[in-house]
A protein has these predicted regions:
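Short loop/turn segments immediately following beta-strands, especially the blade-tip
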Residues: 103-110, 290-297, 303-306, 377-390, ...
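Structural signature of eukaryotic scaffold interfaces centered on beta-propeller domains
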Residues: 62-71, 130-134, 193-194, 327, ...
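Conserved blade-ending motifs and adjacent loop-strand segments that build the rim/top face
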Residues: 182-189, 305-309, 340-345, 388-416, ...
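Glycine-centered coil/turn sites that cap beta-strands in beta-rich domains
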Residues: 714-733, 737-758, 767, 779-785
């Protein structure tokens, strides 16, 4: 329905998960339209919601983002229930968007039955939106649940406006309530879609920059009462630091340390390097990740050099080799038509046979457009080089320019019969209380004789004059607010069967696999060891090589005493270390702005990763949280899993040289290779192919791991008891066992417990517990059932107990 504001609205580009009456107006319905144009209101038929003309109180609903199952017999959607019950009531805003399922969609469609709508069990008690089915029928969604259960950091705040944001992509197994955080997004993921090749695609808000609210407080006129906490612990105190450290500016006049990554945002920042331009970043790009949380990157490794903007500032002012202009390697005409505060939304794949890898999306600006703009098409299947990307405009490219008279489009959906439907609003100006948008479903119709020969327009609306309702709800006035409005028709999906996607298998590159074999390291044991400690392994083969399209950061690079890559004459940069940063929720503001924002913090021990520093080959002579770059240019490090990370190469004098511009998340147990510095799409800047060297840094790390950290149990123990930090895991009984066994453990204090069973090869078999437990002794019986309810066979299994970052494990023997 219509609203008086667009900021934070459920149809907007970001912050669209909130539940106020302006953000999520109550009074809507989940609708079903048949081929004759007849509309049914499924939620109303099932007893949800309040009819038009009545006050939207405790039973008022808003709905969004349906997703039909592969077999067409079920459907997911998100719904928030409850509006203000009386004048001045704001308590309803504590109600959350939750995921619901229609379990009999085929009967609803074919037999006219009432939808059986049930709330999915086990989902987080936070705002859960954009639900989709996984290839294995698990449910994938975005949520504003705080990472690692850090409830005191709620709501997590974005890196731009410091407003509430979702924290990334999650996966729910409805069978047992297990929730997995697949990707941690400091500024939010939106519009999830599972492609036929198994990639979860999402629009991700890119904002890796310093805190502009902090700069406004320090150098502007608005005091946000910024504070940086000592850690993410609920008991952590705000830091009060000296203003200088080692003779350099360190903290402001209140003792709040300045941010350290990336470059300065304000010209008044005393930590600013005068040889570097100010750094700001605001763009929406498409990202991909597997259903297991691996392979997280921009879609096909396509970034701003392929998809966005008009130019990027060179990172070093005194280096004439660097340029603010894009490389001509990527000739995509899209570059000239977008700005830095925009991006791609509502991406959907063409479902027709033979069209896999073809996608349709909406290009929209950031504010006051309800994530609407122009429609375009591109083909980019998995493995496609994005330097060859071509954009096909389906609508006039001048949408959002002053000359636009074409209206605004969103939610493109290609039907199985080759018809494209969109949500269309005739309004061409920006949203305002006097210029409100009204979206209706329309068919796209090709316009003849246009320069592009691909331009389409919206034909007649499928609902005619639209769906009109009288909406009433309580606000501040003595009587309920009332308006007669046309309802927005958005989030279109076709009810049909679709190809179930292939699942992307766990992967390791051949070269790194060969190094593991040469060092006699069992890949599965290494993965299991990392999973138990919530770790991932990242590998770079040659950090002196750069992608040919990146002209903005240094590419004449040299490891002192080692490899060098210098495709151009001029300045050569020595790189000696990779400094790793983790997204810590430690920035807070005044009491009227609760929650936490992430800050890029050098890699360090934490509750979730209590021994990350000793696990790595960190160099105390380098910058904090850094590992040495090998003479061959290689890098290897264990890093926190399920937490956003970024990094930079630095010189022997600790000068940042090449910075990562995005936050990346890795899955527990993932072994991830980046062949060069930021990856290579085609050729390197030196004209070389992707590096094929065996990374010596990986070899060094594996040798240390084997001698110091490989504490996996190698035999079935007799009556073994493992204890660590107030956590005791007793040997299962009986052991060996037939059919079932009892597992006991003791906690010295209340804590969140995750009890997992792994195979001897490191594959997850079952999750027996994933919840908060009281202090004392607890017992769990395992009936030999795996995650898919099948019975396990004879063999050795590992029982792993994780409690607040500490992990203890025992082996068990099953006899069938």
């Amino acid at each position: 329905m219509h609203t008086s504001t667009s900021f934070g609205h459920q149809m907007e580009t970001f912050g669209n998960h909130l539940t106020s009456m302006t953000a999520a107006p109550r009074g809507g319905d989940l609708c079903l339209m048949d081929v004759n144009g007849t509309v049914r209101f499924l939620t109303a038929e099932a007893g949800f919601g309040i009819p038009s003309g009545q006050v939207q109180t405790e039973k008022g609903i808003a709905v969004r983002q349906p997703c039909v199952h592969w077999d067409g017999k079920r459907a997911l959607f998100s719904m928030v229930i409850g509006g203000p019950a009386k004048r001045y009531d704001v308590s309803y805003q504590n109600n959350r968007w939750q995921i619901y399922e229609i379990t009999n969609l085929d009967e609803v469609v074919n037999q006219g039955k009432v939808a059986n709508i049930v709330k999915l069990p086990g989902q987080p008690s936070y705002n859960n939106v954009s639900p989709i089915y996984g290839s294995d029928d698990k449910v994938i969604f975005t949520s504003d649940a705080p990472p690692f259960g850090l409830a005191h950091t709620y709501p997590c705040l974005d890196e731009y406006e410091s407003t509430p944001i979702n924290t990334g992509i999650f996966k729910l197994d409805p069978a047992n309530g297990t929730v997995t955080h697949l990707s941690h997004s400091p500024s939010g993921d939106f519009d999830l879609f599972l492609a036929t090749d198994g990639r979860i695609l999402s629009t991700r808000w890119e904002h890796l920059k310093r805190d502009q609210q902090a700069d406004e407080t320090r150098f502007g006129s608005n005091d946000y009462e910024i504070k940086t906490f000592e850690s993410e612990l609920a008991s952590a105190k705000p830091i009060v630091a000296p203003q200088t450290k080692d003779g350099k500016p360190f903290a402001d006049s209140r003792g709040v340390p300045y941010e350290v990554f990336p470059e300065a945002l304000s010209a008044e920042d005393p930590t600013r390097d005068p040889n570097e331009p100010l750094h700001d970043f605001n763009e929406f790009l498409i990202w991909e990740v597997s259903e297991e949380g691996e392979g997280h990157q921009t879609m096909n490794h396509a970034g701003r050099h392929e998809f966005g903007g008009l130019y990027l500032a060179a990172s070093k002012k005194n280096d004439p080799n660097l340029s603010e202009n894009f490389s001509t390697i990527t000739k995509n005409k899209y570059h000239g038509t977008v700005s830095s505060d925009a991006g791609i939304f509502q991406l959907k794949e063409d479902p027709r046979p033979g069209q896999q890898g073809k996608f349709y999306g909406t290009w929209s600006r950031e504010f006051k457009r309800f994530a609407s703009g122009r429609i375009f098409e591109f083909t980019m299947p998995k493995g496609f080089n994005p330097q060859n990307l071509e954009i096909i405009d389906w609508t006039h490219p001048d949408i959002d320019n002053s000359s636009n008279s074409k209206g605004h489009f969103r939610n493109p959906v290609m039907l199985m019969n080759g018809t494209m439907l969109v949500s269309y609003a005739t309004q061409s100006d920006l949203f305002s209380p006097s210029t409100t948008y009204h979206f209706q479903i329309a068919k796209m119709e090709k316009v003849s004789s246009t320069p592009s020969n691909t331009e389409h327009k919206a034909s007649d609306r499928l609902t005619g004059a639209g769906i009109e309702r009288t909406i009433k709800y309580w606000g501040d006035p003595a009587q309920p607010l009332e308006a007669v409005v046309k309802m927005n028709e958005v989030d279109i999906v076709e009810v049909t069967t679709r190809q179930r996607p292939a699942k992307i298998p766990v992967h390791i590159e051949d070269i790194e696999k060969q190094v593991l074999q040469e060092e006699q390291v069992d890949e599965n044991q290494l993965r299991l060891w990392m999973k138990e400690r919530n770790l991932s392994l990242i590998v770079v083969r040659n950090a002196t090589e750069r992608d040919a399209a990146d002209l903005q950061q240094p590419f004449n690079l040299r490891v002192p005493g080692g490899v060098s890559t210098t495709p151009n004459g001029g300045k050569v940069y020595d790189i000696s270390h990779l400094q790793i940063f983790q997204a810590d929720l430690v920035r807070g503001y005044r009491a009227s702005r609760p929650g936490r924002r992430v800050l890029a913090t050098p890699l360090h021990n934490s509750t979730q990763n209590p021994s990350i520093e000793s696990t790595n080959l960190l160099d105390p002579t380098g910058p904090q949280g850094s590992v040495k770059i090998g003479k061959d240019g290689s890098i290897a490090a264990f890093v926190p899993a399920t937490r956003a990370l970024t990094w930079q190469t630095v010189s022997p004098t600790k000068e940042p040289i090449v910075r990562e511009r995005q936050w990346i998340t890795f899955a527990p147990g993932e072994i991830r290779t980046c062949p060069a510095c930021h990856g290579i799409n085609g050729k390197t800047k030196a004209g070389n192919d992707i590096p094929q060297n065996k990374p010596e840094a990986l070899r060094d790390l594996l040798r240390t791991w084997k001698s110091d950290f490989n504490d996996l149990i190698t035999s079935v123990p007799e009556g073994d008891v493992k204890s660590e930090g107030g956590v005791t895991l007793y040997q299962n009984h009986p052991n060996p066992f037939v059919n079932s066994t009892e597992i006991s453990y003791q906690l010295s204090k209340a804590a969140h417990v995750t009890l997992r069973i792994y195979s001897a090869q490191g594959q997850l078999v079952a999750i027996l517990k994933d919840q908060k437990e009281t202090a004392g002794t607890h017992k769990v019986r395992w009936n030999s059932a795996s995650e898919n309810s099948s019975q396990v066979g004879t063999g050795i299994y590992v029982c792993s107990l994780q409690v607040d970052g500490r992990v203890v494990s025992n082996k068990m023997l099953s006899i069938r």
